[in-house]
Amino acid sequence: MTKGILGRKIGMTQVFGENGELIPVTVVEAKENVVLQKKTVEVDGYNAIQVGFEDKKAYKKDAKSNKYANKPAEGHAKKADAAPKRFIREFRNVDVDAYEVGQEVSVDTFVAGDVIDVTGVSKGKGFQGAIKRHGQSRGPMSHGSHFHRAPGSVGMASDASRVFKGQKMPGRMGGNTVTVQNLEVVQVDTENKVILVKGNVPGPKKGLVEIRTSIKKGNK
């Protein structure tokens, strides 16, 4: 069955395995995960738990900042006897009977050796050209060439008379939801509520990440 938790990417470090192997790891801090709602096949058509992460400030009239919860969010969290949450995500195909509304989901949900998928929002790079954004080749930089880093031809002859959708061109790069699959949990620190994940995960430092059981290898 699927397991899941939300956390913040703290950064990268390294640890040593039992055989002395150096392992690069990403530190993910996962605090304040609370089950806000349980969904079942009978009522909702599928099994899932809804998990909230990081508290929001209580409802305040005329508050314009998104740091404050609105009344519907406050009422929804109140059913779980919890504070309103800033981030709410669903984890499907879980053992619903193993969770209760209001229960805290801790890092010991995972153990060392678990294979997981990690989802985050990639770092934003701003407006970039076709070489950096798509890995296209540049032209000659000397010998009279006037073609250096331009994207080259993007259109067709008079038969098509248009640029096809999806043509690789300069534009905004990064800031996309990215999932890295089949990463390994190296260590779980229940005292500091952190998970050490082998390799790197998407997003900047302090970015939100979603950790769940690997969809390909988790149930094998």
Swiss-Prot record:
Keyword rRNA-binding: yes
GO BP, sorted A to Z: translation
Xref: Pfam families: Ribosomal_L3
GO CC entries: cytosolic large ribosomal subunit
GO molecular function terms noted in the UniProt entry: rRNA binding; structural constituent of ribosome
Span list, region Disordered: 130-156
Record's keyword terms, sorted: Ribonucleoprotein, Ribosomal protein, RNA-binding, rRNA-binding
PROSITE patterns attached to this UniProt entry: RIBOSOMAL_L3
Gene3D superfamilies in alphabetical order: 3.30.160.810, Translation factors (2.40.30.10)
Membership in a protein family: Belongs to the universal ribosomal protein uL3 family.
Function field: One of the primary rRNA binding proteins, it binds directly near the 3'-end of the 23S rRNA, where it nucleates assembly of the 50S subunit.
NCBIfam families membership: L3_bact (TIGR03625)
Subunit note: Part of the 50S ribosomal subunit. Forms a cluster with proteins L14 and L19.
Name listed for the protein in its UniProt record: Large ribosomal subunit protein uL3
Lineage: Bacteria, Bacillati, Bacillota, Bacilli, Bacillales
Gene label: rplC
